């Protein structure tokens, strides 16, 4: 699992635009496309329906949305929890 791919998925779902997601994430549009493609390949389903400049979540993308939000929340908590004891030890 690539946490950056999950975050990219959430940003594309939010903005409904690969270019806008790229700008928000400070990466290139090709990086966004590659991350989404990789995620789709690992899951085995298309996550977005792409129609003439319009992007929307596919049924699989909608199903992934809740899990993706949970994953990023847990990841942030883990980072905070792991970083906190280290910071406390350094200040002693």
Stretches found by the model and what they are:
Residues 60-77, 85:
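Short, solvent-exposed amphipathic helices
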Residues 15, 24, 37-46:
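Residue cluster at the C-terminal edge of the helix-turn-helix DNA-binding motif
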Residues 6-13, 58, 65:
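Hydrophobic residues on short alpha-helical segments
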Residues 2-8, 29, 61:
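The N-cap/first-turn positions of alpha helices
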